[in-house]
Amino acid sequence: MNLLEEKIKSIDIKLASKSPRRHQLLRNIIKDFEIVSKEIDESYPKSLKDSEIALFLAALKAKSYKEEAKENQLYITADTIVVYKQKVLGKPKNEKDAFNMLQELSGNTHTVYTGVSLLFNEEINSFVDATEVTFYDLSKDEIKFYIDHYKPMDKAGSYGIQEWMGYVGVKKMEGDFFNVMGLPLHRLYREIEKIISKKN
């Protein structure tokens, strides 16, 4: 049991996400939690920009659990988006779409935003984290190799930084590495601690 787990042992943690990356990441700071998920309409107002979108969607997911959440249950929801030149790059529709996205990101800097919401005892606390990622110039062969041998289809921006593309394609990064994977652990740890300290 680690330090955070000692503090939250009376709390029922629920990670509301299908993402295997988020499951893997959360286990690094909390071992005992339940995975839940539901389908919701993830459309958002077109007036929202960049970080506001990730924040809105994370909060929207948290609100969807408000009626069923019981006392001392902590729901964690998150949404990750990739933004390049004010354009949101979501999950690719097909391999051609993935190829086009990676060509856009090649040789350029983009921003990854992850919004996180914590629903605890009817109160929702939300935050957003940002990481800037710069890619090397990628050849068409490199992009095709990645798409053929890895799993870009379930990832915003068509790449996973923890996969081959992250090892050979990323030139530099400013911010939380885990944020790019889908869960900003450093900030999440501290935000959970804040909630627990209020409870106590």
Locations of regions flagged by a protein language model:
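N-terminal beta1-alpha1 ligand-phosphate binding loop
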Residues: 2-30
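Anionic-ligand binding patches
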Residues: 2-3, 9-14, 49-200
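Cofactor-binding loop segments of dinucleotide-utilizing enzymes, especially the Rossmann-like FAD-
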Residues: 18, 38, 121
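Short, glycine/serine-rich, charged loops/turns that create anion-binding
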Residues: 20, 40, 185
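N-terminal short leaders/motifs
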Residues: 22, 28-33, 72, 78
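Short loop/helix-cap segments at secondary-structure boundaries that form the rim of catalytic
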Residues: 24-28, 45, 67-68
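A short beta-strand-loop structural module common to alpha/beta enzyme folds
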Residues: 34-44
